[in-house]
Regions:
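Short helix-capping/turn signature of helix-turn-helix
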Residues: 49, 107-115
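Short hydrophobic/aromatic patch on the recognition helix
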Residues: 17, 39-49
Length: 182
């Protein structure tokens, strides 16, 4: 039972930290705030994570694995009648300020120099996502190019910037419709 309690505390700390990082950024949230909001001692925190960098890395790994699972489910599901519906679901999953991708997106801009190992986690996910989108495109368009998957990921990033600036999902949807018509 003790391991289950320890696991619960570590998981709570991961999710608390992820939410704080999404709201305030990686550099404005310190260990003190995380342990306070996760209701754990600093000693317990360092016992689980050893450092803030390791915590960030684990937060990003959790987000990455959740996203991979969801993207695979979308790309393998037969419930979507065509490519347009699959791409729409992948796009909407990522172009969301409350979603798992937003933390990985923030990491690209905020942690490169301070936390290089965690930064690599975010880059690896983007590379994986581009490859996955390429194969989704390739299944329906025999002449799909890798550049199209690059454009799709850049479009997701642009939608996030748009949401940060105006917080209007309408702009996000307009961008997607333009891409899908091409």
């Amino acid at each position: 039972m003790k391991n289950l309690e320890a696991s619960f505390r570590a998981t709570r700390a991961l999710y608390t930290a992820a939410e704080l990082f999404k709201q305030h950024g990686f550099n404005k949230v310190g260990v003190d705030r995380i342990v306070s909001e996760a209701k754990m001692t600093k000693a317990t925190f360092y016992n689980y994570f050893h450092s803030k960098e390791r915590l960030i890395e684990m937060c990003l790994l959790v987000q990455k694995e959740q996203l991979k699972e969801k993207v695979r489910a979308i790309s393998e599901a037969r419930q979507y009648p065509d490519l347009v519906h699959q791409l729409r679901q992948i796009y909407l999953l990522h172009a969301d300020l409350k979603g798992a991708y937003y933390l990985l997106f923030k990491a690209i801009f905020e942690i490169k120099k301070l936390y290089p190992n965690a930064y690599q986690t975010a880059l690896r996910y983007r590379r994986w996502l581009k490859n996955e989108i390429f194969w989704v495109l390739r299944e329906s368009k025999k002449r799909a190019t890798y550049e199209e998957s690059d454009i799709f990921v850049f479009m997701i990033d642009g939608a996030i910037f748009g949401l940060l600036g105006t917080d209007q999902a309408k702009d996000r949807d307009t961008l997607l419709e333009y891409f899908l018509k091409r």
